[in-house]
Swiss-Prot record:
Homodimer. Substrate binds at residues 148, 174-177, 265, 338, 360-361. CDD domains: RLP_DK-MTP-1-P-enolase. Pfam families: RuBisCO_large (PF00016), RuBisCO_large_N (PF02788). Binds 1 Mg(2+) ion per subunit. Its cofactor is Mg(2+). GO terms for biological process: carbon fixation; L-methionine salvage from methylthioadenosine. Has no RuBP-carboxylation activity. This is 2,3-diketo-5-methylthiopentyl-1-phosphate enolase. The gene is mtnW. It comes from Bacillus cereus (strain Q1). Keywords: Amino-acid biosynthesis, Isomerase, Magnesium, Metal-binding, Methionine biosynthesis.
Length: 414
């Protein structure tokens, strides 16, 4: 294979999956085949999409009810020749799912890149090992928290929040994805002030915390804004990838003048991936493509919290981010939304050690504030790594957290 193989979930009311697959393969490549003269067929053969797999799935009554018709469901795979497209994500996505995405009854499940094609993508600049080296933390999951309620607040408020989270033992603090450039907390001022706070905490407590600042602005201003952030001392860039596009992420990741990790936020991705019947699968969108395009971290809904993905999907995202690949470094999985300390054993069991535990309300909502919230999570992480039940841990901050949010993991075995 020198091109790309696309895997689709299709729904067909004509009940002929092979015919539908062939129509897709032709429609996204040369347009027609059987009516072409033999000589022209020979000329175009190298450009034709080839159906390589058709698998019928069991009938699904909920699908029939939603579509208001009886359909046959199937998984199909089509190989697209590298000759047909340039080696970039806009061309690849348009080739494999461009006009087909308008069908409303087809879901792009996966894309399998040839080795030749993979060479054109950067992958993470730092990856899991590089991030761990920045923090000098190699033996446990990382802990991340979020600035809360920053809109309309000034730098002083930001500094207080940041200090409390860092003292609590948080490894990374990120901006809220809806915090854009503004007069009260402009980008460079956030970075400079934040770095001062984090350096002070490090000198006093010996704990290093990184700050992920939100990279925003018009598309053609992003590189300049990113370079300003780097010059101001930014540790990590948070980026709302799907508000801009995967190719924009790639252009940032490839730029040598932006030598910092990039954290991909999933905002807007639900518009592409939420349906089970059409769109793009979450594992492909938030896993494989983000990693290939250069994200060092990928945030996605956890299977446990307030905006939950199905566990199978969340684990598939993580697999794409962390599986061995000779071409790419591994990206950190960041299962998010509604996480509190009682979920830590679940996260460690399901995602392993190389994961970022991301909490907002689970840290800020602690009765002892963000310091107490961070310490509760760190106690939960330490106990989990020792395979010790959380309710047996002698830590007042963790006990308070479990009283507020519960301990759903009390019977979890690692």
């Amino acid at each position: 294979m020198s091109g790309i193989i696309a895997t689709y979930l299709i729904h067909d009311d004509s009940h002929n999956l092979e015919k539908k697959a062939e129509q897709i393969a032709l429609g996204l490549t040369i347009g027609s085949w059987t009516h072409l003269p033999h000589l022209l067929q020979e000329q175009l053969k190298q450009h034709k999409g080839n159906v390589i797999h058709v698998e019928e799935l069991a009938e699904h009554e909920h699908t029939n009810s939603y579509l208001r018709k009886k359909v046959k469901r199937g998984i199909i795979k089509i190989e697209y020749p590298l000759l047909n497209f340039s080696p970039d994500l806009p061309a690849i996505l348009t080739t494999t799912f461009g006009k087909l995405s308008l069908d409303g009854e087809v879901k792009l499940i996966d894309l399998t890149f040839s080795d030749e094609l993979k060479k054109h993508f950067p992958g993470p600049k730092f990856g899991i090992d590089g991030i761990r080296n920045l923090l000098q933390v190699h033996d446990r999951p990382l802990l991340m928290s979020i600035f809360k309620g920053m809109i309309g607040r000034n730098i002083g408020y930001l500094k207080t929040q940041l200090r409390d989270q860092a003292i609590g033992g948080v490894d990374i603090v990120k901006d809220d994805e809806i915090l854009f450039e503004n007069a009260l907390t402009p980008l460079t001022k956030r970075i400079v002030s934040g770095k001062e706070v984090l350096q002070s905490v490090y000198e006093t407590y010996g704990h290093k915390t990184l700050y992920a600042v939100n990279l925003t602005g018009r598309t053609f201003d992003l590189k300049e804004n990113a370079k300003r952030a780097v010059q101001a001392g930014a540790d990590i860039l948070l980026f709302n990838v799907f508000s801009y596009g995967l190719d924009v992420l790639q252009s940032l990741a490839e730029d040598d003048e932006i030598p910092v990790p990039i954290m991909a936020h999933p905002a807007v991705s639900g518009a592409y991936s939420a349906s089970k019947l059409y769109g793009v699968s979450s594992p492909l969108l938030l896993g494989k493509l983000l990693r290939y395009a250069g994200a060092d971290f990928s945030l996605f809904p956890s299977p446990y919290g307030s905006v939950a993905l199905e566990k199978e999907e969340a684990l598939a995202i993580s697999k794409y981010l962390t599986e061995d690949d000779a071409f790419f470094k591994k990206s950190f999985s960041v299962p998010s939304a509604g996480i509190h300390p009682g979920f830590v054993p679940f996260i460690a069991r399901d995602f392993g050690k190389d994961v970022v535990i991301n909490a907002g309300g689970g840290i800020h909502g602690h009765p002892n504030g963000a310091q107490g919230g961070g310490k509760a999570f760190r106690a939960a992480i330490d106990a989990t790594l020792q395979n010790k039940p959380l309710h047996e841990v002698d830590d007042i901050n963790l006990h308070s957290a479990l009283q507020i949010w519960g301990n759903p993991s009390h019977e979890v075995k690692l």
